[in-house]
Amino acid sequence: MIHSKKLTLGICLVLLIILIGGCVIMTKTNGRNAQIKENFNKTLSVYLTKNLDDFYDKEGFRDQEFDKRDKGTWIIYSEMVIEPKGKNMESRGMVLYINRNTRTTKGNFIVTEITEDSKGYSRSKEKKYPVKMENNRIIPTKPIPDDKLKKEIENFKFFVQYGNFKDFKDYKNGDISYNPNVPSYSAKYQLNNDDYNVQQLRKRYHIPTKQAPELKLKGSGNLKGSSVGSKDLEFTFVENQEENIYFSDSVEFTPSEDDKS
C-alpha cells in the first residue's frame, strides 16, 4: 500500500514537472512570438511614406556600425515577379539609395528575365537603367529610346509610397518562427483580396491570378535591433514549380557607402 502511494506520488510529481516545463516553454514561445511581431510592427511603421524626400529627415535604427558623423542611407526596393505557366520568369523593380549625408538619391530600374536552355539550365539576363530622385520624382540619368519603358520608370511608385500596415497589430493566426542559430525570424499571414494592400497591388500591376496572397515577413539579425541583417516582405500569390507570382519589398537603414549605385 505504501509502495503504491509512493508510486502514485512519483507519477504525479513527474506529471507536474512536465506540466510546469510545458507552461514555461509555452510562455517563452508566446513572449518571443510577441517580440517578433512587435519587431515587424516597428519596421512596418515606415509605411506609408508618400514623399520619398521625407526619408532625408527620417531617422532609423543606429548602432555601433555607424560612424558618429554618418547620418545613414535608406535603401528602398520594390519588385514584381511573374512567371506564368510555360513562360519565362520576369521581374521588374527599382532600388534607390537615399543618402542622408549628401541629400542625394540614385539607383536603378532593373529588368530581369530568367530562361531555361535546352539542357534545363537556368539563364539570367539583367538590364539596369540608372535613375535619380529629385523632388519625389524618378528621373532616368541616361537616354531611354523606348518611350513606353521611359514612362514606366518615371511613373514608378515604391510600395512604401502606397502600402499601409496600420492594422498589422490586429493580424491574427500568423505562423511565426524563429531560428536562434542564424538568427532569423519570420511571420506568415494568409490575406484575402479585400485587404487594402492587396487591392493596391492589383491596381498597379497586372497580376494574372485571382488567388489571394500570403504575406511573408522575413528578418535576420538581433531581435532587439541591429543595422546588420535585413528585413523584407513578400506577397506570394502563386508559388510552385510551374508558376510563380509574387511581389517583394524592403526598406532598410544602413551605414552610408558613397560608391552605391
UniProtKB/Swiss-Prot annotation:
Compartments it resides in: Cell membrane
Taxonomic classification: Bacteria, Bacillati, Bacillota, Bacilli, Bacillales
Stated family: Belongs to the staphylococcal tandem lipoprotein family.
Any Pfam family: DUF576
Residues with a covalently attached lipid (S-diacylglycerol cysteine): C23
Keywords: Cell membrane, Lipoprotein, Membrane, Palmitate, Signal
Domain of life: Bacteria
Protein name as catalogued: Uncharacterized lipoprotein SAOUHSC_02788
GO cellular component, one term: plasma membrane
Signal sequence bounds: 1-22
Organism: Staphylococcus aureus (strain NCTC 8325 / PS 47)
UniProt topology in membrane: Lipid-anchor
NCBIfam families the record matches: SA_tandem_lipo
Positions where lipid (N-palmitoyl cysteine) attaches: C23
Entry annotated with the keyword Lipoprotein: yes
Keyword Transport part of the UniProt annotation: no
